[in-house]
UniProtKB/Swiss-Prot annotation:
Superkingdom of origin: Bacteria
Molecular-function annotations in GO: rRNA binding; structural constituent of ribosome
Keywords on record: Ribonucleoprotein, Ribosomal protein, RNA-binding, rRNA-binding
Gene Ontology biological process terms in this record: translation
Family: Belongs to the universal ribosomal protein uS17 family.
Matching InterPro entries: NA-bd_OB-fold, Ribosomal_uS17, Ribosomal_uS17_bact/chlr
Ribonucleoprotein in keyword set: yes
Record protein name field: Small ribosomal subunit protein uS17
Assembly notes: Part of the 30S ribosomal subunit.
Residue ranges, annotated region (Disordered): 1-26
Pfam families linked to this entry: Ribosomal_S17
Length: 108
């Protein structure tokens, strides 16, 4: 019995010790009014679990931007299309960082 438990814990430890790639999302910046932070809205389409109808779902993520200082130096504007990646928690609700700006907004 103990041998089986030891084997199980060894396999769990080996599986969790390897890290995969961080999750990435592409979305539109909806707010840039914070220092070093932007709010990114990510839209996705998914079927309803019971009825199967395709729904449009959206989630908002707070993402960290190192060189963005709101009143003085704005590097990312509202409407910009950005790629964000998952990272370690930077604050209470910031767990994403901006990797790159894919497309600048046209109404600057």
């Amino acid at each position: 019995m103990r041998e089986k438990m030891a084997e199980a814990t060894e396999t769990q430890a080996s599986e969790t010790s390897t890290r995969g790639r961080p999750k990435t999302r592409v979305g539109i910046v909806t707010s840039n009014k914070m220092q070093k932070t932007v709010v990114v809205t990510v839209q996705r389409r998914a079927p309803h679990p019971k009825y199967g109808k395709i729904m449009s779902l959206r989630e908002k993520y707070k993402a960290h931007v190192e060189d963005h200082d709101y009143p003085k130096k704005i590097t990312i504007n509202e409407g910009d299309r950005v790629r964000i990646a998952e990272t370690k928690p930077a604050s209470k609700d910031k767990r994403w960082r901006v990797v790159e700006v894919l497309e600048k907004s046209k109404n600057v």
